[in-house]
Amino acid sequence: AGLELLSDQGYRIDGRRAGELRKIQARMGVFAQADGSAYIEQGNTKALAVVYGPHEIRGSRSRALPDRALVNCQYSSATFSTGERKRRPHGDRKSCEMGLQLRQTFEAAILTQLHPRSQIDIYVQVLQADGGTYAACVNAATLAVMDAGIPMRDFVCACSAGFVDGTALADLSHVEEAAGGPQLALALLPASGQIALLEMDSRLHEDHLEQVLEAAAQAARGVHTLLDLVVRQHVQEASVSLGD
Amino acid sequence: MLQKREKVLLLRTFQGRTLRIVREHYLRPSVPCNSPLCPQPAACRNDGKLLAAEVTHYVIPDWKVVQDYLEVLEFPELKGVIFMQTACQAVQHQRGRRQYNKLRNLLKDARHDCVLFANEFQQHCYLPREKGEAMEKWQTRSIYNSAVWYYHHCEDRMPIVMVTEDEEAIQKYGSETEGVFVISFKNYLDNFWPDLKAAHDLCDSILQSRRERETESQETHGKEYPEHLPLEVLEAGIKSGRYIQGILNVNKHRAQIEAFVRLHGASSKDSGLVSDILIHGSKARNRSIHGDVVVVEMLPKSEWKGRTAALGENDSDDKASGESPSEPMPTGRVVGILQKNWRDYVVTFPSKEEVQSQGKNAQKILVTPWDYRIPKIRISTQQAEALQDFRVVVRIDSWEATSVYPNGHFVRVLGRIGDLEGEIATILVENSISVVPFSEAQMCEMPVNTPENPWKVSPKEEQERKDLRTTHLVFSIDPKGCEDVDDTLSVRTLNNGNLELGVHIADVTHFVAPNSYIDVEARTRATTYYLADRRYDMLPSILSADLCSLLGGVDRYAVSVMWELDKTSYEIKKVWYGRTIIRSAYKLFYEAAQELLDGNFSIVDDIPELKALDKQSQQAKLEELVWAIGKLTDIARHIRAKRDRCGALELEGVEVRVQLDDKKNIRDLIPKQPLEVHETVAECMILANHWVAKKIWESFPHQALLRQHPPPHQEFFSELRECAKAKGFFIDTRSNKTLADSLDSANDPKDPLVNKLLRSMATQAMSNALYFSTGSCAEEEFHHYGLALDKYTHFTSPIRRYSDIVVHRLLMAAISKDKKMEIKENLFSNKNLEELCRHINNRNRAAQRSQKQSTELFQCMYFKDRDAETEERCIADGVIYSIRTNGVLVFIPRFGIKGAAYLKNKDSLVISCGPEGSSEWKPGSLQRSQNKIISTTAGGQSVTFHLFDHVTVRISVQASRCHSDTIRLEIVSNKPYMIPNTELCHQSSLLKSELVKEVTRSVEEAQLAQEVKGKVIQEEHQEYCQTKGRSLYTLLEEIRDLALLDVSDSCAM
């Protein structure tokens, strides 16, 4: 017997309605050594992002790009992040793919042409995985990049969405992801409405795509308001401590 | 706004390790309470159904009560029931999907006054489970806490009764809060519903059967059956291909031994199996019941068994194909049941003698279900003696591995055995047809039309609708005496010389609002049920016979489809769909219309609308009408020809006839003469259906309701080809066109019955036409094989088919979509529509089955009291249409009966026919070959029966206490039965209808004798008298009726 992901009354397993996000809490500037850092909790998904740069190219100089900065992303997830303990925290195929996706996302958002021949490192670590890890990583990294003071076009806000019984569900939890339905990950630049990255798992009829996309975008805009609040608060705290 | 909590679950994995799972749990300040007493309805967002306002208290069942007594809570008399989410989840997790779905449907059903309260998502109601607290205790605590909150939420204005089975809880909470009472369920029924006897009985019987089960599980005697495997193992096994999933289909004639598993979906492709899987014996069947979705493990090839082709005890149809008995087929055994298909069963208690022989435990009684395919059920009751002469409804509770038979409990009494009303009720229950009279709430929604307060066309509607009352000559053609006229026709010449053809259908959706009580009821019924002597309407008679019926001379709302046709080529130029107001000028009947068409005007006196007029205006009116009918026929011929040309077919007696028959009233007891007018009307309806199908599909490509008729499987035609070959005909079954052509040519001039039988076999090989939702099917599959149309739907009979109501709503939505107006109708999504289609298809099959069973019931009652030996009418002429190892299957055209006749009886004596045509039983042997069977006696005499031979048979009734009676046939002679010529025409007119009439009359007489008023509607019988003479058409229709049913029997599995 499969779980009832959406009850007749419109509740999901954890008590949310279809379009509601999980609780989001975030903090910027968690580490002093790094140029920028941030920590985010989306429900029970917890992620830590650290940014170094922009700095000179490390390693082989040949990787340097003449016209823009190189964005280097690394994703890892803690061995204790999932229900059953993982073997290796990074370097597996899934982590590599996630790293590439993050890179793609941030190349689209960071104004890389301002820093030619330099490198920006983004390290993301997932401490607890409960669905929507990609979204949590992007959101954490956005805050970290801002904390590092690297110019961006806009926030990048990400959120996942699924589709159950003709209804689009925003911000899937692990239980909902594991049920095996279609799942869409969207990274949005909210001000312009441009899409930085869109990814889809499993099949979905094209007629429903628009609906799911809209749900994800709506959720991403919701994430944006929250992140915006966090940034403003952080800036305020920072300016108070500077004594302005 | 939301508050986050965390729930920690400890699960055990397959490997036996414990897994700690943390789930989030969000609480909100308000969830819909669905109470009319709610102080802040806006905050609660009560938009669904509300509890009734006039109840004296609310009742909140504990989780255990919901699990065990859901059937009692289903009584519509129990009002103000609040199901807590905690209790629903307990049902979902511990009682399985079936029970949970029942609960869900109950909550959705507008007729039941119950709601769900999502207490676990409400911040004040949610209680986290404490460390070390038992699940059960927590559930009860949580439900009580929510009940208290609910009481305060309604500002203490409505007392709340929480019913629980937990004595401790009653002790603990009983007097904790004023206004919230905690009592036991039994106590509740006694105090609050002392008069609801049915509920008490049901409650007692559930209680008793549960007690039995408990004591039984303590006794540990040897297991009768192997245990079912756990669900995970089954699912993994199905995925890996080790097990096969399918639906269990018990052989009616050898219910003890033989069952087949029809493969389900993808598994058939993977395993490479074509045929069904045989399940041999009740051990291998392992407690699964007919219709269950089971998981099967294949046995090694060495253990495979063959099916039997011999005629069994009760063999009356010809389903088993002609395989020889020795040929082994894939055989398996059931290892688990995925979904139980238990429903209500009609059973008979054993008679007194049998009870005594059952002996030691008199309280547990084995009852025999009416349906052969269901095993005997063990019932615990003290009323066994009182119930022995009745048909009784029971439900199965459980079937433990330790018990040979399933345990059940008694639900209600239907009626006496052998009593007409009781038997009809049996047929209804067995087909899960529930036709309670329409309730008051439903009737309140109906418009009024009384002489004091006549119904009128409202001015608002007059503005919105196109008014055809003065501009168009609208008329209807129906069988005589028909009262639910749902279609009318019109034709006229436009100013530009083109023709305008119009089909106007009763606008039922105007009166039946979506999701109103009446709509819900109609949806559940899905169709009007026609039994042999009565019918159960889908809509109340105020609609079906009055306001929606397009009677002559009165204003009625209609939905119209109008085509502009080219004046000469009849090419369709334009089409218009919309709501209209019409006034039908004539309500013609078929015979009259045909007479007018043929230019025979003497019929005028039979047309009431013309009779009253003076000569001159009569003449003018008549000319107008005759022109319209003539034109209509001409157009219909053209359309028909075009359809034929498009690779279509002339497949007599398949869908065209069904269509025609379906079109108006399937009081199939009024078989129609094959007049051309029938065809004309049918063709116009097909055209309308086709165009509406196109329209709704274009507007709603993923949620339109259409009707498909898949092409038949070639393998099914093999029997037909074999039979035809016996007579020297060749049947080409490659396409519908060739099939129709070769059937036409397969005509034996000496015996017209041969052709009819071949056609009925062809019909049998066809798949059934089905409703479906366009979103769930590829476009190529929309095709309608029988009509050779790419898209088809049902639009023309909304009075008696729910599918047509859905199509009407779709069409209305499509029109407003075209006009860029907002769509008022709330349409079904693809998923819901698909579910609805399944329901309607299911109900249609039930309707057909019940119709067939009721016909058989009447046949049996007709022959029951006659002495087969002496009475002349029990002897009839029959045709052999199939050969088996120990007998033949015979069709008797005079009564439309199909049945088996044995050539070898129980004592292994075979039949032998003397030269003068008399027959007797003698020792000997039988020899069967492809198309003949030879019976040789020990003395050396032999008789040969060929396929399509005419024989004389004697009809008698085999009475049965527990099941329906059956007709038994006995071959009297191998010569055709000769009816004395003078009697021929008189005799042969005895059709099913006459038979029904006679039976009903005798029943009525019996009832009158007891001074009980016969409930059967007399007027219906007047109409049966109209049938005169036996036409081949009617004959074919009858064969088809039975044939189609046989097929549907197998499809229903």
UniProtKB/Swiss-Prot annotation, chain B:
GO terms for biological process: RNA catabolic process; RNA processing; rRNA catabolic process. Its cofactor is Mg(2+). Gene3D superfamilies: 2.40.50.690, 2.40.50.700, 5'-nuclease, Nucleic acid-binding proteins. Catalytic component of the RNA exosome complex which has 3'->5' exoribonuclease activity and participates in a multitude of cellular RNA processing and degradation events. In the cytoplasm, the RNA exosome complex is involved in general mRNA turnover and specifically degrades inherently unstable mRNAs containing AU-rich elements (AREs) within their 3' untranslated regions, and in RNA surveillance pathways, preventing translation of aberrant mRNAs. It seems to be involved in degradation of histone mRNA. Its EC number is 3.1.13.1. Belongs to the RNR ribonuclease family. GO terms for cellular component: centrosome; ciliary basal body; cytoplasmic exosome (RNase complex); cytosol; plasma membrane. Residues 236-310 form the CSD1 domain. Residues 306-332 are annotated as: Disordered. Keywords: Cytoplasm, Exonuclease, Exosome, Hydrolase, Magnesium, Nuclease, Phosphoprotein, RNA-binding. Coiled coil: none annotated. Its main location: cytoplasm. It comes from Mus musculus (Mouse). Residues 465-816 form the RNB domain. GO terms for molecular function: 3'-5'-RNA exonuclease activity; enzyme binding; exoribonuclease II activity; RNA binding. It is found in: Cytoplasm. Component of the RNA exosome complex. The catalytically inactive RNA exosome core (Exo-9) complex is believed to associate with catalytic subunits EXOSC10, and DIS3 or DIS3L in cytoplasmic- and nuclear-specific RNA exosome complex forms. InterPro entries: Dis3_CSD2 (IPR041505), NA-bd_OB-fold (IPR012340), RNase_II/R (IPR001900), RNase_II/R_CS (IPR022966), RNR_Ribonuclease (IPR050180), Rrp44_CSD1 (IPR033771), RRP44_S1 (IPR033770). Pfam families: OB_Dis3 (PF17849), RNB (PF00773), Rrp44_CSD1 (PF17216), Rrp44_S1 (PF17215). It catalyses: Exonucleolytic cleavage in the 3'- to 5'-direction to yield nucleoside 5'-phosphates. The keyword Metal-binding does not apply. This is DIS3-like exonuclease 1. The modification Phosphoserine is found at residue 989. Residues 365-431 form the CSD2 domain.
